[in-house]
Amino acid sequence: MEQFSQMIADALKLPVHRVENTLKLLQGGATIPFISRYRKEATGGLDEVQISEISSRYEKLLELSKRKETIQSTIESLGKLTDDLRRRIDGCWDATELEDIYLPYKPKRKTRAEAARQKGLEPLAAWLMLQRGNALDAYVKNFVKGEVKNEEDALKGARDIIAEQVNEDEQARNQIRHQFSRQAVISAKVVKGKETDEAAAKYRDYFDFSEPLKRCSSHRLLAIRRGEAEGILKVSITPSDETECTDRLERRFVRGNNECSRQVCEAVNDAYKRLLKPAIETEFAALSKEKADDEAIRVFAGNLRQLLLAPPLGQKRVLGIDPGFRTGCKVVCLDAQGTLLHNEAIYPHPPKYEYQLAGRKLVKLVEQYRIEAIAIGNGTASRETEQFVTSQRFDREIQVFVVSEDGASIYSASKTARDEFPDYDVTVRGAVSIGRRLMDPLAELVKIDAKSIGVGQYQHDVDQTKLKEALDQTVESCVNLVGVNVNTASSHLLTYVSGLGPVLAKNIVDYRTANGPFRSRRELLKVPRMGAKAFEQCAGFLRIPHAENPLDNSAVHPESYPIVERMAADLHCSVSDLIANRELRSRISPEKYVTDTVGLPTLTDILQELEKPGRDPRQKIQVFEFDKNVRTIDDVQEGMELPGIVTNITNFGCFVDLGIKEKGLIHVSQLADRFVSDPTTVVSIHQHVRVRVIGVDRERKRIALTMKGM
């Protein structure tokens, strides 16, 4: 591990001891949120992103180390592992370089070169490589026998052997790699006969496309690759000047100008076209795809984080509406804990159009269930339903919110929803999800596959394993940042708490159901399979409101309770008094409580937490209203200034909900009156923005927006 620690430290420009300590904690079973929050002294205050990067790099080095062992074992079994070769493999920590070293020894399917060797042509190839003279015809005749029919057959076989040697030459591969890295151009052409396909229309921009690979943005590259996968586009990656590639190879392998050197020259050109170029093109295609995947996953994870940390309404009685025309609007009433109290359908819109009756029912439900806020899904009939709701006269002031439905239909048909509401249909479950999403977006969204939430960029085209890891890590980070009420949380939410997972999460809910609410964090140790390690990892992130010890409802870890108790004792007060009295807290000198294991970073966190125990880091929710005059894309006119909500962020800009079916696009160049390279520095998911319409394409259902000058 020491060697890996040093390599990671060098790559990330971090002191090696911080990397070593982080790796020890990770290998000891500590989670990233726990290390980031409660082990700052060990890591020097590394954040979750840095800890995750250390973990990722360690896993890659471990994988590479195993690959090296496999390669050495294979070469040794061939009897070709020299001391020099072993040293080269041991000292290699670059995956591409390692495979280049291995290539000459790698078991191959039967190649043209191997077939030529079996015909006894290897000595001819070796003689040609000497490039000493012109007595070619006489020498070649010696090899015309057996399966070799004539001189040309012999020369062709010898050239095949030379071509393979050129292909397996490390320096040659690096030369071509260098040319690709400097000059690679990605080109796309429409497949002949596909121009008029309906599916091809969205790839029209790439029918005759060419761009330097290093300048090709991730969203363009993923779009091109999707077009290729669908059989619409033919894609290639080549250096802009291929002559320079062959010239470099000729300078390396061809000497003089005689009959032999001309044969070598021909073999070198064949090696480039048939072997080297396709291999390096495949390599660069994979590398560029991996880079595009990483960028798309980064954007998706960032969007998901903002969505999960959206402002919650909190524990209030909510009426949720899943709007619709023909099937009506499904209405549910929820108590402050999100429990379903009532459901029914109303029909305020055509074709039934029971407007007055629907209004009376709605007013009665608001009064009967003492509703404090109404959540309306943003799908079909959303604007009409919002207008219907806001036109009613309630007996109290009711806040009305439009809530994203993305993923609600998937949740309503899921096993999770069926287990939760076995006696209700999908429409009721969907309306409940909409209402709960207003109360606590994080608690509700964790029940839905993150890929279904609709804030990704080509999420189905990227590496699915890496995507799942990134999204799971994002959910885990958000859940632990906010903290979880152990007495109300679902098993889905508890699953993402540091140190728990599905089994312990279910055990906690089962214990709670059987024994009533938890009264202290220590009681968690009575949960089946809750060991000391799991308790250490989860305790600080679980909250117990109204606990006897107020610290149980804070982010102060139980291991630090003695420190807080000592602070209170030194001030001759109780822990409750210390939390309630700012003047008492101001008299604390954190330096006084520093020990070998607890430093100022932890003490600073403790004092901040005592100011507002269990505080929610999410912002306060705000009511938003769309322009009442805009109901469809036909109402949108160039020059209009409209309110909107950012719903998705990509590399090329962001999409904005204007309260109609079609989302508007603010291109990255229109986000601000300055150059913007990263849209996330200007906008965030759910941000309320004011935009101006700069283009409407009703045929293609596209709306172009700007924030410049707004």
Language model segments and positions:
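Long, highly charged, low-complexity intrinsically disordered interaction regions
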Residues: 4, 56, 63-80, 90, ...
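Short flexible coil/turn linkers enriched for glycine and charged/polar residues
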Residues: 15-16, 28-29, 121, 227-231, ...
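Short, ordered loop/turn segments at secondary-structure junctions
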Residues: 38-40, 129, 240, 323, ...
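Duplex nucleic acid-engaging cores and interfaces of nucleic-acid transaction enzymes
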Residues: 50-53, 60, 64-320, 326-412, ...
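Structured, non-catalytic alpha/beta "coupling" segments that mediate domain-domain communication
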Residues: 74, 88, 98-102, 227-240, ...
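A glycine-rich phosphate-binding loop feature that marks nucleotide/adenosyl-phosphate handling sites
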Residues: 178-185, 321-325, 379-384, 403-410, ...
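Short beta-alpha junctions and helix-cap segments that line functional grooves
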Residues: 318-320, 330, 386-389, 520-523, ...
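Single-stranded RNA-binding regions, centering on S1/OB-family and related RNA-binding modules
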Residues: 544-710
